[in-house]
C-alpha cells in the first residue's frame, strides 16, 4: 500500500489557477529539422546579453579574432561574450539591440573572413573527475546563460543553489504559441540534452530530477523516453497544455505542489530550474569545450516562405535570418522577437540575435488580426480570472496609470510574470502588460535612486565621523602639547614648588617664645624700613624725571603759557559781564596794583643780581609777560568799573607811566649788560618786552582819558608826546636787539 501511494505521489500533477488556451500555431515550424544558416558579412555582438553588468573589453579595433575567442572578461556576475566567427574587429561602438526600447548599447562589430576558424578547444569528457567549483567556473567563463528568456548567468545560479537543492527541474514545456525551438532541439539532440542534465545533476547533487514537458510535443516526448529508457534517476513528466505552464513558478507548482514564496526564489524551497537549451549549452561548454556562440531560433509566420528552426550565430542581423527563410514583407509588416504574448515588436531589422532570442515571428496582416483601439475598462474581472499569479490586473492597471507606486507595490506587481494572459482576455483591448512593464521600470528606477541616496548619505556620515575623529585627535594633541612643559621650564617649576613647600613648612612651624623674653622683630623692622626707603627713592627718581621732562620740553611750556592766557581772557570776560551792583573796591584794586609793582621790582632785582653765566629762560619770560598783561587788563577793567566819585589822580598815573618806562629801559640795559658776547638775545623775549611796554603805555593813556575829572584835564599834547616817546623807545630797543643778534 505504501509503495502504491509513493508511486501515485511520484507521478502526481498539480494545476495552477488561471491560464488560457490560445491557438498553438506550432505546426508551422516544428515539422522540419534544424538547419544551418550561411554566415553573414557583419556581426554585431552586444557586450551585455544577460542580467547583470557588461564585461570588460579585452579586444580592440583591428584585432583578428577566432570563433569562440572571448571579447570580454567575466568577473563576478559579469558574463563574457565570445566571437561567433573568425574575422576582424572593425568597430566598438553603441548599436541598437534586441530590446523593447531599442536603446543603443556598446557592441563589438566584426567583419567575417568566411573561414569560421575555431580557437583550440579543450573538452572535459571525464567531467566527473572535476570539482564542483571547476565546472561552475568553466560554465561561467564560456558564457552560458539561461536561454529560456530570462538570460540569468547559469554559473551564478548554480553557485547560489549550493547544497540545499533537492529537486532539479528541466523546463521543456515551451508553452507560448508559435515557438518550437526547444521542441525541435529535443527531437534532434535529445542525447546531448540529457548529457547536459547529468552535468547539472553532478554539480547540484539533487534528490530528484524532473523534466516537465507539455503533451503537445509527442515527437520530443518519444525521443526523450528513448534516451531515458535505461535511466532511473531522471523522471519525465508530461503535463497538460495550458498557457503559461512554462513559467518558473507555475511549472514548479505543477510538478512539486510547492509554491515559491512572495519575493523569494525557487531555491528557498529547494528547487532549481533550468531550460532545455541551457542544458544543451552546458554540455557543449563542458564536454566539447565550445563557448556559446549560437542557439536555436524559430523562424515562423505567414510572411516567411520557409519557416523552421535554425542554428543562428549570436550577433547575426535579424534581416539576414529572415531573408534566408524567404521573408516576404507587406506594406505595414511587423516582426516580433519572441512569441505573440510575451514578445515585442522590433523597431528595425538590423538588430542582432542575442542569447535570449528564441523566435522571430513575421505574421501577415490577417494572421493576428487588425489592431484594436484601446477602450475603457468595464471591470469585468476577466483579467483576474486568467492571471496565473493570482494578482488583480485591474487594480494594478489603475495604480500604474495613476502613478501610485506604493499601492502597486503593495498589490505585488513584482510577482507579475508578464505572460500576457490578462491582455489576451481583455474585452477592452487594454495592453495591460505594457502598463505593468512601465510601472515596474519606474519602481526599479525609484529604488535605484533611493539606493544611491542611501549610499551617498552613508558616505557623507562616514566622512563626518572621520572629520570628527580627526578633529578630536588634533585637539588631544594640542592639549597634550600645552600640558607638557618644555625641558627648561621644568626646572623653574620645580624650584617654585620647592619654595612654596619651604614657605609652607616655615608657616606650619610653631613660634616658641621663652618666658620673660621679648620677640626679636629687628629683621622685620629692617625689611620694612628698606622697603620704605626703596619706595621713596623711586618716587624721587620719578619726580626728577618729570621735572627734567618739563624743563626740556618747550612744547609743554608753550602749552602752559597758552593756558595762562586763556584763563586771563576768561577772567576778563567774567568781570566785564558782572552785574552793575557788584562794584569792585578801588582800594583793593590799588593794593593789587601795588603788589604787582612790588613783584615787578623784585623780579628786576633778581635779574640784576643774577650771575652773568646764568641765562634767562625765554619761555619763562614769555609766561611772565603774559601774566603781567593779564593783570594789567584786569586792573584796567576794575578801574573802569570803579565808582565815579573815586577818581584816580592823573598826575599819579603819569608818574606811574614814567616809572614803568624807566623800569623798561633799565631792564633792557641790564639784559644787554649781563648777556655774554657769544650769547645771543632771544628775539621772542625782546618782542614780548616791547609788547609789554606798548601795552602799559596804552593803558596809562586810557586811564588818564577815562578817569580825569572835567575840571582837571590832562594836557593832550603832553600825553601824545609821552606816548610817542614810549613808542620810539620801544622801537629803538627792538632795533638794538636785532643789531646785537647780528
Swiss-Prot record:
Compartmental location: Cell inner membrane
Topology versus the membrane: Peripheral membrane protein
Entry annotated with the keyword Membrane: yes
A biological process term (GO) from this entry: electron transport chain
Sorted UniProt keywords: 4Fe-4S, Cell inner membrane, Cell membrane, Electron transport, Iron, Iron-sulfur, Membrane, Metal-binding, Repeat, Translocase, Transport
Enzyme class, broadest EC rank: translocase
Record Pfam families: Complex1_51K, Fer4_7, RnfC_N, SLBB
GO cellular component, one term: plasma membrane
One Gene Ontology term of the molecular function aspect: metal ion binding
Protein name: Ion-translocating oxidoreductase complex subunit C
CC cofactor: [4Fe-4S] cluster
UniProt-listed Enzyme Commission number(s): 7.-.-.-
Gene3D superfamilies named among the record's database cross-references: 3.30.70.20, NADH-ubiquinone oxidoreductase 51kDa subunit (3.40.50.11540)
Known role: Part of a membrane-bound complex that couples electron transfer with translocation of ions across the membrane. Required to maintain the reduced state of SoxR.
Family to which the UniProt record says this protein belongs: Belongs to the 4Fe4S bacterial-type ferredoxin family. RnfC subfamily.
Residues that bind [4Fe-4S] cluster 2: 387, 416, 419, 422
Positions contributing to [4Fe-4S] cluster 1 binding: 377, 380, 383, 426
Cofactor: how bound: Binds 2 [4Fe-4S] clusters per subunit.
Originating organism: Escherichia coli O6:H1 (strain CFT073 / ATCC 700928 / UPEC)
Disordered: annotated segments: 602-719
Signal peptide (UniProt feature, chain positions): none
PANTHER family recorded: ION-TRANSLOCATING OXIDOREDUCTASE COMPLEX SUBUNIT C
Superkingdom of origin: Bacteria
Domain 4Fe-4S ferredoxin-type: 369-397, 407-436
SUPFAM superfamilies in alphabetical order: alpha-helical ferredoxin (SSF46548), Nqo1 FMN-binding domain-like (SSF142019)
Subunit note: The complex is composed of six subunits: RsxA, RsxB, RsxC, RsxD, RsxE and RsxG.
Amino acid at each position: 500500500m505504501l509503495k502504491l501511494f509513493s508511486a501515485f505521489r511520484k507521478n502526481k500533477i498539480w494545476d495552477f489557477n488561471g491560464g488560457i488556451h490560445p491557438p498553438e500555431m506550432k505546426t508551422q515550424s516544428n515539422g522540419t529539422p534544424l538547419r544551418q544558416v550561411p554566415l553573414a558579412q557583419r556581426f554585431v555582438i552586444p557586450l551585455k546579453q544577460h542580467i547583470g553588468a557588461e564585461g570588460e573589453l579585452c579586444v580592440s579595433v583591428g584585432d583578428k579574432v577566432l570563433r569562440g575567442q572571448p571579447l570580454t572578461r567575466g568577473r563576478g556576475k559579469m558574463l563574457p561574450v565570445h566571437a561567433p566567427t573568425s574575422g576582424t574587429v572593425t568597430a566598438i561602438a553603441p548599436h541598437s539591440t534586441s530590446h523593447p526600447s531599442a536603446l543603443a548599447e556598446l557592441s563589438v562589430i566584426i567583419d567575417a573572413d568566411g573561414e569560421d576558424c575555431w580557437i583550440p578547444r579543450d573538452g572535459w569528457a571525464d567531467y566527473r573527475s572535476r570539482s564542483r567549483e571547476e565546472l561552475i567556473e568553466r560554465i561561467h567563463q564560456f558564457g552560458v546563460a539561461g536561454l529560456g528568456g530570462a538570460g540569468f548567468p547559469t554559473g551564478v545560479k548554480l553557485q547560489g543553489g549550493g547544497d540545499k537543492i533537492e529537486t532539479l527541474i528541466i523546463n521543456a514545456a515551451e508553452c507560448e504559441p508559435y515557438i518550437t525551438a526547444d521542441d525541435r532541439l529535443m527531437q534532434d539532440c535529445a542525447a546531448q540534452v540529457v548529457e547536459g542534465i547529468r552535468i547539472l545533476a553532478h554539480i547540484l547533487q539533487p534528490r530528484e530530477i524532473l523534466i516537465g514537458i507539455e503533451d503537445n510535443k509527442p515527437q520530443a516526448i518519444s525521443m526523450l523516453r528513448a534516451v531515458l529508457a535505461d535511466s532511473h534517476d531522471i523522471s519525465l513528466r508530461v503535463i497538460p497544455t495550458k498557457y503559461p505552464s512554462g513559467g518558473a513558478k507555475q511549472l514548479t507548482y505543477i510538478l512539486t505542489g510547492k509554491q515559491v514564496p512572495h519575493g523569494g526564489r525557487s531555491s528557498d524551497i529547494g528547487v532549481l530550474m533550468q531550460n532545455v537549451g541551457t542544458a544543451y549549452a552546458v554540455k557543449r561548454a563542458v564536454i566539447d569545450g565550445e563557448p556559446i556562440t549560437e542557439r536555436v531560433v524559430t523562424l515562423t509566420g505567414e510572411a516567411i516562405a520557409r519557416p523552421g528552426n535554425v542554428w543562428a550565430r549570436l550577433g547575426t542581423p535579424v534581416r539576414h535570418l529572415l531573408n534566408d527563410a524567404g521573408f516576404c514583407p507587406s506594406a505595414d509588416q511587423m516582426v516580433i522577437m519572441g512569441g505573440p504574448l510575451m514578445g515585442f515588436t522590433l523597431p528595425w531589422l538590423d538588430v542582432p540575435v542575442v542569447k535570449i532570442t528564441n523566435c522571430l515571428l513575421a505574421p501577415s496582416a490577417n494572421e493576428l488580426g487588425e489592431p484594436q483601439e484601446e477602450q475603457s475598462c468595464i471591470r469585468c474581472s476577466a483579467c483576474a480570472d486568467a492571471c496565473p499569479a493570482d494578482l488583480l490586473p485591474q487594480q494594478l492597471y489603475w495604480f500604474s496609470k495613476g502613478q501610485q507606486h506604493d499601492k502597486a507595490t503593495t498589490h505585488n506587481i513584482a510577482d507579475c510574470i508578464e505572460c500576457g494572459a490578462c491582455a489576451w482576455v481583455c474585452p477592452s483591448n487594454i495592453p495591460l502588460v505594457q502598463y505593468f512593464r512601465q510601472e515596474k521600470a519606474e519602481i526599479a528606477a525609484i529604488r535605484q535612486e533611493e539606493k544611491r541616496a542611501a549610499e551617498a548619505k552613508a558616505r557623507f556620515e562616514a566622512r563626518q565621523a572621520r572629520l570628527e575623529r580627526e578633529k578630536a585627535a588634533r585637539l588631544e594633541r594640542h592639549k597634550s602639547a600645552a600640558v607638557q612643559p618644555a625641558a627648561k621650564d621644568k626646572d623653574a617649576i620645580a624650584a617654585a614648588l620647592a619654595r612654596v613647600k619651604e614657605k609652607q613648612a616655615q608657616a606650619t612651624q610653631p613660634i616658641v617664645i621663652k618666658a620673660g623674653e621679648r620677640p626679636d622683630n629687628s629683621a622685620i623692622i629692617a625689611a620694612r624700613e628698606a622697603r620704605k626707603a626703596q619706595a621713596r627713592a623711586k618716587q624721587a627718581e620719578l619726580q626728577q624725571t618729570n621735572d627734567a621732562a618739563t624743563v626740556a620740553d618747550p612744547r609743554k611750556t608753550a602749552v602752559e603759557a597758552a593756558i595762562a592766557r586763556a584763563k586771563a581772557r576768561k577772567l576778563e570776560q567774567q568781570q566785564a559781564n558782572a552785574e552793575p551792583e557788584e562794584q569792585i573796591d578801588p582800594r583793593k584794586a590799588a593794593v593789587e596794583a601795588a603788589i604787582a609793582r612790588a613783584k615787578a621790582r623784585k623780579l628786576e632785582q633778581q635779574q640784576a643780581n643774577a650771575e652773568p653765566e646764568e641765562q634767562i629762560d625765554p619761555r619763562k619770560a614769555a609766561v611772565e609777560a603774559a601774566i603781567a598783561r593779564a593783570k594789567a587788563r584786569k586792573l584796567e577793567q576794575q578801574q573802569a568799573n570803579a565808582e565815579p566819585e573815586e577818581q584816580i589822580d592823573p598826575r599819579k598815573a603819569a608818574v606811574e607811566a614814567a616809572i614803568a618806562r624807566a623800569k623798561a629801559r633799565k631792564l633792557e640795559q641790564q639784559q644787554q649788560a649781563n648777556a655774554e658776547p657769544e650769547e645771543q638775545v632771544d628775539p621772542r623775549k625782546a618782542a614780548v618786552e616791547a609788547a609789554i611796554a606798548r601795552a602799559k603805555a596804552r593803558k596809562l593813556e586810557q586811564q588818564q582819558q577815562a578817569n580825569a575829572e572835567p575840571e582837571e584835564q590832562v594836557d593832550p599834547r603832553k600825553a601824545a608826546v609821552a606816548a610817542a616817546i614810549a613808542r620810539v623807545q620801544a622801537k629803538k630797543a627792538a632795533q638794538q636787539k636785532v643789531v646785537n643778534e647780528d
